[in-house]
Amino acid sequence: MSKETFQRNKPHINIGTIGHVDHGKTTLTAAITRALSGDGLADFRDYSSIDNTPEEKARGITINASHVEYETPNRHYAHVDCPGHADYVKNMITGAAQMDGAILVVSATDGAMPQTKEHILLARQVGVPYIVVFLNKIDMISEEDAELVDLVEMELSELLEEKGYKGCPIIRGSALKALEGDAAYIEKVRELMQAVDDNIPTPEREIDKPFLMPIEDVFSISGRGTVVTGRIERGIVKVSDKVQLVGLRDTKETIVTGVEMFRKELPEGRAGENVGLLLRGIGKNDVERGMVVCLPNSVKPHTQFKCAVYVLQKEEXGRHKPFFTGYRPQFFFRTTDVTGVVTLPEGVEMVMPGDNVEFEVQLISPVALEEGMRFAIREGGRTIGAGTISKIIA
């Protein structure tokens, strides 16, 4: 079945496999394509084709990730699988593959391991809203050890609940056996995908959210007024809509008197489109790149937040030395850099290149911020880290 024949008449969901190294994430990804290919809903992808991951860049950071697509009878899925732990951290923090939900793969023989816990915490920090658990390698458990699996399940449920993931379904199976064609275990993979269908809700589409456009450029057109250009991040804007300009200065309200695309007048602009908006009563000096134009009161300007951050290693062209509380890099949000001061949490003396850390930031100017938003950290124009806002403070 070629890529082109995938019909887009089903809701689209982004998911990924997360979990400890060697617990079977990639094997499960391959097993899902095997199970669904039997129903003509996927192209079978073997382990090596998924494991051999291409490099991609997100927010100036190189990430290895494999993208697989498949369908269930109800939905179309894009599934991301990463080879190494550092790639998961980078992938989740940069939002390279924004996940609507995740499949947490845990080996029944090992139970929850350090990276299991780290991935659950990371999922919470970056705003992955739902998790479904696949308890893998169940074929390795002898009958006398069967009770241990119940304990592993209990421990997992507690661990997930601690981080705010309540009542996650847990499906037992064997990815390897399913991949080898064992019918009973293929059925378990189908059961897993049914649980994913049922427990990971379809996200609200970008077009249905409140209007927001980051401003990339500002022009003044003589006799007509000021035009701001950018790519609409979400929602719809129509001529004569009331909007606000938020960030960098005091919030201003104005009215959209024109929407243009490729020099043509349009009645409206929609999520994903590059447009110019003509704004009533706004001078060229009242507005600048880095502000957003949005539905009134849908976004507020903020200066202080907590964030989950990945700091690039030297080999990834990051810093060569650690940084400390008081460090003042630039934080790049949407279309602009703003200087901010870092405060490390108690007990953390310094941050080394390659670390994955949570800290607070105080910006010198207000920016339109929201929890779950991604940003890059830059020094002199080069990226040295990436982050996600986990909590707005002020």
From Swiss-Prot:
Annotated localization: Cytoplasm
Provide the residue span(s) of the region labelled G2: 60-64
**Region G5, annotated ranges:** 174-176
Say if the entry is tagged with keyword Protein biosynthesis. Answer: yes
User: What is the top EC class of this enzyme, as a single word?
Assistant: hydrolase
Stretches the record annotates as G1: 19-26
Annotated GO molecular function terms are: GTP binding; GTPase activity; translation elongation factor activity
Region called G4, residue ranges? 136-139
Q: What top-level branch of life does the organism fall under?
A: Bacteria
Per the UniProt entry, the Enzyme Commission number(s) are 3.6.5.3
| Annotated segments matching region G3 | 81-84
Which of UniProt's keywords are assigned here? Cytoplasm, Elongation factor, GTP-binding, Hydrolase, Magnesium, Metal-binding, Nucleotide-binding, Protein biosynthesis
Tell me which residues bind GTP: 19-26, 81-85, 136-139
Binding residues for Mg(2+), per the UniProt record? 26
Q: Which GO terms describe its cellular component?
A: cytosol
Location of the tr-type G domain: 10-204
The record, for Pfam families, names:
GTP_EFTU, GTP_EFTU_D2, GTP_EFTU_D3
Q: Tell me if Oxidoreductase is a UniProt keyword of this record.
A: no
State the similarity comment: Belongs to the TRAFAC class translation factor GTPase superfamily. Classic translation factor GTPase family. EF-Tu/EF-1A subfamily.
Q: Summarize the protein's role.
A: GTP hydrolase that promotes the GTP-dependent binding of aminoacyl-tRNA to the A-site of ribosomes during protein biosynthesis.
Assembly and interaction partners: Monomer.
Q: Which HAMAP family match?
A: EF_Tu_B
Q: What is this protein called?
A: Elongation factor Tu
